[in-house]
Amino acid sequence: MPLRGVTALSDFRVEKLLQKAAALGLPEVKLSSEFWYFAGSEKALDAATVEKLQALLAAQSVEQTPEAREGLHLFLVTPRLGTISPWASKATNIAENCGLAGIERIERGMAVWLEGALTDEQKQQWAALLHDRMTESVLPDFQTASKLFHHLKSETFSTVDVLGGGKEALVKANTETGLALSADEIDYLVENYQALQRNPSDVELMMFAQANSEHCRHKIFNADFILNGEKQPKSLFGMIRDTHNAHPEGTVVAYKDNSSVIKGAKIERFYPNAAENQGYRFHEEDTHIIMKVETHNHPTAIAPFAGAATGAGGEIRDEGATGKGSRPKAGLTGFTVSNLNIPDLKQPWEQDYGKPEHISSPLDIMIEGPIGGAAFNNEFGRPNLLGYFRTFEEKFDGQVRGYHKPIMIAGGLGSIQAQQTHKDEIPEGALLIQLGGPGMLIGLGGGAASSMDTGTNDASLDFNSVQRGNPEIERRAQEVIDRCWQLGDQNPIISIHDVGAGGLSNAFPELVNDAGRGAVFELREVPLEEHGLTPLQIWCNESQERYVLSILEKDLDTFRAICERERCPFAVVGTATDDGHLKVRDDLFSNNPVDLPLNVLLGKPPKTTRTDKTVTPSKKPFHAGDIDITEAAYRVLRLPAVAAKNFLITIGDRSVGGMTHRDQMVGKYQTPVADCAVTMMGFNTYRGEAMSMGEKPAVALFDAPASGRMCVGEAITNIAAVNIGDIGNIKLSANWMAACGNEGEDEKLYRTVEAVSKACQALDLSIPVGKDSLSMKTVWQDGEEKKSVVSPLSLIISAFAPVKDVRKTVTPELKNVEGSVLLFIDLGFGKARMGGSAFGQVYNNMSGDAPDLDDAGRLKAFYSVIQQLVAEDKLLAYHDRSDGGLFATLAEMAFAARCGISADIDCLMDKFLPIHLPDFQGDPAEDLSDELYNHAAIKILFNEELGAVIQIRQKDRDYVDAAFETAGLTDAVSRIGSPDFDNEFISFFGYGYFLEQNRADLQRAWQETSHAIQRLRDNPACADSEFALIGDNERSALFADVKFDVNEDIAAPFINSGAKPKIAILREQGVNGQIEMAAAFTRAGFDAYDVHMSDLMAGRFRLADFKMLAACGGFSYGDVLGAGEGWAKSILFHPALRDQFAAFFADPNTLTLGVCNGCQMVSNLAEIIPGAETWPKFKRNLSEQFEARLNMVHVPKSASLILNEMQDSSLPVVVSHGEGRADFALHGGNISADLGIALQYVDGQNQVTQTYPLNPNGSPQGIAGITNADGRVTIMMPHPERVYRAAQMSRKPEGWTELSGWYRLFAGARKALG
């Protein structure tokens, strides 16, 4: 059944499409669009169901669909035929929970109408513009949409005739199906199947290919190496293990699980207690830290959104499946691509070399990929707090080096109970379970495909190898895992793995093989969302959001109850055996698609030997005396590795969970310059965790081992200003990217691993976890020319550490302290090597020597001094030197404070000249030629040796100097100037001024790339509005003007009375903000309970048992029918629930708070809330983008009981939403004078604002929150529950100690209830 919806594309989206069409030379057309919905059912729906369906979808059923005609062309964009979209899964869930019987599935399409004359070829070009071929189809008419619901006929497996056709038969199958088997592996399989006297099934071959792919088995890291004719003594992995063997202390799990586990602390963890009817309680327990980082490069090249999304999702599952279950906490993301070539902003260093047709352009990757990664993290509910973004594409020694195959890195940290850190052994007879989403025909052969050079595979096989993500169901699965580990020693999970490359065919065998078991599986028990899949497709597809785990049969009822409460699908698929044999039975065809010993699959296929030789790069001396230093400064600031990353950061929720202390944004202007991320371990502690990154790929072209050491060094200098203590507390993850097989690259990889291993051992560091991606080469045919782009060896180091006190973290924001000074610590000790620098890149000047960590002991000493200064509160600001050199370091510190800097490099010049011009004897001010002076100044300002700038008080100068002297680092330290808060000029002088520029002008250049991509991706008017605020310090600044004593707890008398009103912390599937909500209300003296909508439906809880209701933030049902709409309709369409909620809202003795998704949901219940007749709905942000920011709000006088104690105050608060714009279309666009506006966005001058992003969503009158007539029901889009502690705020106002101003809201609610 088709149903017609509302307009699909906003005016600016239409305009962007028309501009793209014009750029392709397409004729002018008029474009209109609308959503269409298609409901599949086995029989015709009755009138009552159709009416409900129309209300649910806000759409109208039609008897006849419109058709294209002469001059009016229809493009019906639907989910790709043969697939089921995540949107459909969630929409169908809503329909089921709303009681709509008989609906098999609901899909959504978009009808685009083009009015004008178009040829068939032009229509094909338009079709390409209108859809993503990875996930969508374009249909010519509405009748074809019926194919969305076609079911294929089931087929059995096929075999490859190795008994009759021998090795040649397998070689042919290998090529045709993209198995990526080596010649040795083909011989191994032929030998084993001939011994078994049977032919392999296609299922077994695909399973073997995935399980033994480079992606899964890391064959190169375990290989023997012969370099320059000599066999090397150790494998790559052996050298990595050496770091752990030398320094195992502080590491709990290394090399043998989905993630590494490092030592944490005993803290009070906060979660619902099943033994106390899901009451939230603190639990004192030893809690360790999970660390994991991996890459998803190949899928991101093919389909950036889906590739990055599933990269984030897979890494999250790795964390959750560590030990016997754990909780992911905070994420990191990074991207490396070739040159962007942004239209109208092509940079002078960029040349367009071309690319293969089937991979995405670097610009498309950076428009779509970050949204995919952020969207998954956002919807799952994990803050993304750290990252990097680099572009590189240069001709070097006759080869084009770059990242046509991009790096997309996803990682993070999590928390795990000490007693859950190690998996138990699976006994015979244990049940083998799939938890999470159903199988679909996506992601076939991803492990093998990602192990091949991009372009060597058939495009259709690359296409098949990419997965699609559904974070909402992964959230449900994680809730099940949480409920299990929270049972402590009653946890039913024996062992758990995530489902990744190879799908179930890799995950289940891995699960049982770890315990030395075999297994019998029933293929038709695997949950599927598509009919007609072959056994190979069922067993090997890489559908996401799945885990495999084992439990005892006696625990099945407990596990089932948890899954049903969380509405998370699961199935018992198999049973563990003690015979070491793997059998997969197919009852449909009464055969066994898999039937072989596990040791054939996971045994010891032939060990790889790598042979390579040293290829020495050509060396050119660096010279830049003829380059204008001011122009150089602006160029360097525009290079993406240096430039602002706002467009990557504000799309990602950075506060969900309420544990964030330090995100990327720093200071009262929220400038993206943080060196590292810091989280808190719990709500009752200042202990925490920190993570940082280091990567230097361009340096590897000059000296690969040096690049490895520099990566380690950068990770340390980035994390050094956090209160960690001994350097050995820091643990590293190493992700290795290389174009192995390209001459010289295997040798570089070996020597770099060797160098990093030695450096880490010298630094007392270990690498307990890592990953590799060793096919970083793109090849393609361009007409008659064969082209290739080879990535430099690329190591990414991620550092993780426990933190003693998060409050001592020092940021790059300069402080307005009279008489403060800036000290520069140069760990390059004047060498100023320029190889691989940002400066070199922006001038295509690939010359000079590579910077290096020459003495690990001196870096260790530097770290120790900074730790001492952090612990003693001697640092006002800290920023490491990295991309862009000292110039960029100082500029970013000035940007964060919006001040000037006066920097004198005389002393640096005095150190530079004896090293680089030893024969020079004159006066630099008089006798140095302009060219030599310019050359020296450029090297001093733009070299990227390790180092840092610190701001200290003048009175602490002697103490600081003494600390560096004691550490033997006096020769590294120079006083280079001071901040200037009286003007905004960034000035560098040394024997005269040579660079002086206005801060705002430099910052505009720094933010230009981010602004340009934001304009292309989002509403360009919003991007322009944000860019314009760079020069407006007054309106941009955060401040606090509170009319109450922040440190007074007005709930204290009620807490002391011992009476605890019960509050229902309400959530629906997909909600992710319940923990911090419960923690805030618990702090204010409430007795908080975890109440799922399934509990209310099943009668396990009744709202009448509670005094207050808090509806939490997140993505109920993935926001598929509009934010909060599906959640609200599951109440309104359910008579018993509707009555229960209506009675609660009518009770004069209750309070209700709805935040974010809860705000959106409660606004849709206005018809059953007394005094809410004038309320708006909340619609998509004006930017049409998810907005995560720290915004200023004002609390006007209103009837709101929970805000009563905060009236007339203004203070910063977190916002994180995609649909927060108050929309009054229901009221004819009119805002009633009776509307109870309870919260408004204001600017830095405390004026209600419409200016983006000070008003992040475009709400009229700055509306951020509203209340009903009697003030008992208050809803708001911002998140006060995430910032009720001062340490949770990215920027803490002066005078706020333990509690923030937002605690008053929760204390006010307690006071209002008496």
Swiss-Prot record:
Keywords for the protein's UniProt record, in alphabetical order: ATP-binding, Cytoplasm, Glutamine amidotransferase, Ligase, Magnesium, Metal-binding, Nucleotide-binding, Purine biosynthesis
Identification of the protein by name: Phosphoribosylformylglycinamidine synthase
Record flagged with keyword Nucleotidyltransferase: no
Major site of localization recorded for this protein: cytoplasm
Enzyme Commission (EC) number: 6.3.5.3
Family listed: In the N-terminal section; belongs to the FGAMS family.
Gene name tied to this protein: purL
Catalytic machinery residues: 1156 (nucleophile), 1279, 1281
Subunit structure: Monomer.
